Every structure is written in C-alpha cells, then in structure tokens.
Amino acid sequence: MRTALFLLLLLALAAIPGSLVPQVTSDPNGVVQYKAANPGLSTVLDALGVFNTYSSIWFSAIYLLLFISLIGCVIPRTKHHFDALRARPPKTPARLARLEGFTTRETSVDAEQAVATARELLKKQGYRAELYDDSVSAERGYLRETGNLVFHTALIGVLVTVGIGGGFGYTGQRVVVEGYAFNNSLSSYDSFNPGRFFSDSALEPFSIAVDSFVPVYEEQNKNALGQAIDYTANVTTTLRGQKPQSATIKVNEPLHIGGTEVYLLGNGYAPVVTVRNPDGDVVFSQPTAFLPQDANLSSLGVIKIPDGLAEQIGMRGFFYPTASTLDSGALASVFPDLINPTLTLEVYTGDLGLDNGQGTNAYQLDVDSLTEIAGRTAAQPTIKLGIGDSIELPDGLGTIELTAVPRFVSLDVHHDPALAWIFAFAVLVVAGLLTSLFIPRRRIWVKAIRGTDGSVTLEYAGLARGDDPTLEAAVADFADKHSDRLGLKVEP
C-alpha cells in the first residue's frame, strides 16, 4: 500500500509540468510561442516530452506502475475481506476489563437469558453476533473495509477507463474566423491528436459555423480596465440529416455535439488583407489569424503570398486593436477591443519555401534567405494600415489594403468514449472513500459471570479497529439499553 501511495504522489508531481508548460494537445499555439520565446530550453523540454506530458514515456511508466501496484493491493485484501465476512466473530476475551469502555451490571436474570437478550439486541443494531457459552461476541463495520476496497477498485477503474478513452478518443484544434465554418473531418483540423486505436469512423459528421464572437471587457474599473469579463461564441451547428441549430460556446461551458465536447480555448483578431497586382486584380484576400502577445491583444502574425505577383511575398506584422504611440515612438495596444485598429507590416520577397515539399509553420517566417523591401532595414518604411487604408507595395508589386478585422476563436474538440465510465468510477471513488472514513469498525462483547450466591454480573467491553472516539459511549449506551431490556435499574 505504501508503494501505491508513493506512486500516486509521484504521479501528481509528474503532472506538474503539464500545467506549467503549454501542451500540444490543448494549446498548440502556445507551444509555438513558447518554443519561439525559449529556443534553447524548448529543445531540452521537447526531447523529454514535456510538451506531451500526459502521453510521455515517463508519465505512462508511473501510470502503469501505479496500476499494477493497486491491483497487487486490492486482490489479497479482497480475499481477506471475503474470508472475514464468512468467518464467525472472534471468541470473547478472558479479561474484558482490559478493553475499552469496560463496564458492569448486576442482575438476577438467568445468564443464558441475559446473553440471549444481548445477542438479539446487538443484531437489531446491525452487529453480527455469535454465542460462546455465557457470552456473546458481536462485530460490525465491515462496510468500512468494503468502502476501502470499492475506493481502490474504482481507482483502478478510473485508470483503465482513462486509458481506454485515450486509446479510442481524439482531440483536435481548429482556429475559426467569424463568418467561417469547419467540418469534423481530419483535413479540417489545424492539429489533430488521435488515440492509439483511433479510427476515422469515430469522426461523426457535423459542422460548426462561427456567426459572431462577443467579448465583454471591464470599462468602469480603472484598475482592471480591459480585463476580460466574458466571452461568448455564437455558432450554428449542423448534424447530418438534421436542421441547423443555434448554440453558444463559453469558457468552461463547452458545446456538446456528435459525441464530442467543443471548448472555447482562445480568441484574437484575424485581419483581412487584400493584395492586388499592378493591374488591379485581387491575388490575395482572406483573414489571417494573428496570435495575441499580451492582455490588450497586441498580436503577431505572418502572411504569405506565393502566387499572383512578380515575386513571392512574405509579410510579418503586428496588429494593435487600440493603437497608441509610446514615448519611445513604438506602437502598443492599450485596450483589447477595436477602437483604433492598426496593422504594421514588414514586407519580404524571395523563395518562401512553400514549393519544396516540406511543411512550414504558418505562424513563422524564415527571413534569412529573403530580402526586406519594407521595414526597419529597408529603404521603404514599415507599412502602416488602418481599416480601409490602401498603400502601394514597394517595387511596383501592387497594392495592399486592410479590408476588415473579424475575430477568430480557437476551438478544442474532445472526444472520449469512456467519459461516462470515468464519471461513474469517480463517484464510486468518492463514495468508497467517505464510507471508509466515517463508518467505524468495532467489536462489542457481553459476558455473564455467575456468582456463588446465584447472582449474575454482566460485563461489557469493546474494541475498535483503528480510531473510534465514540466506542466508549457506544458500549455504555448498549449496556444501558440491555439493562433496560432486562428490567434492571441503572444508577445515574
């Protein structure tokens, strides 16, 4: 049992990195940002599997050892418990005076009748009682050990069902811009983490369209100005063969659809940039999610345009919902809502590496092999746009316009087929724990000693297995009730 407790503590400690470092399964964008901000440390953490803490080898090893240890505890204890349930209560000790709550009563009632009455009364109080000559031995509280076994068995059940759910379930993340939708298919996810036994058939067809995203920010309290109060994503869901339905997703209030839970993880802005070639033809016009960098949603983003212009163009920029110029001359956002939206872009030309067959990060731009044509080190200054502003690109490449700034939401889709079983076992864990903590395991003996003058002395005593602060009172209370049943007068 000590080994199981040690492993349980070790498992809790091993789970700490999962709450300190962003996880690929729940916050892939956060992982990207963390790696960009800590390139040296992230290499070590990645090698150790910290970004996938709960599926790492070391975490799984602790998990499996705990599972084996619990089974090793439960099986022998269960056998011992069943043997104890079938066994008779132990014989009455020779000297009850050494036991807790010892008390005596004098009676003229026949010893056999007194003991038989005690046995009957003990059975009514839920004791298993057995007669031994002129004494009765009784015990109760086996439900305490039953609760203990239920607790440990249910804990094993939780571990098993979590493993099954992880094996057959999946999690996926998708960034969805206002006015757009996504379908529950593999190709629609930005990142997807299937279980070991996942099958495509587990993806129930449905779609979620984000109609609007409504944030509420603090505007009255100057000390908390701009602090988020509430987020609401208004969506339209469609299941195969059913009519579209309106729904909302809030933080900690997921949407239940198609056997999945859809959580609202994050949000931000997705500026719509429209680029035209020198002839005025639109070569690029779509929203691009910019990743928030602070509480006021100053956001960083990358736009890549591989086709339609004389050269491939990559742009790296910042978006400020409420732009304000600092004393240093730099821009910063002072409020997370759209009050003075401003987009700044550094423009690069060259091979973006999109045609070499290797995957690239949509949120990063490798500028080592590119030429900056607008920005801090270029002849042309950084491009600065407000909504509706249009500016010519350097070198006569065309024009660029900030058309609109919709919001985007980051959705996490979670499917766990064992969720109901996990909940059921969790309830059993709590029930078993409470039972094992609050139901006392105790024994009570009543012994009749015959005197030479024909009188009978009744001795009462008890014994607890573990702490039982109410045992003495229970023995005294039973002695009083037994005396009352026999018609004895008890002096106060």
Pin down the residues of each PLM region:
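Solvent-exposed, non-transmembrane regions of integral membrane proteins
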Residues: M1-P492
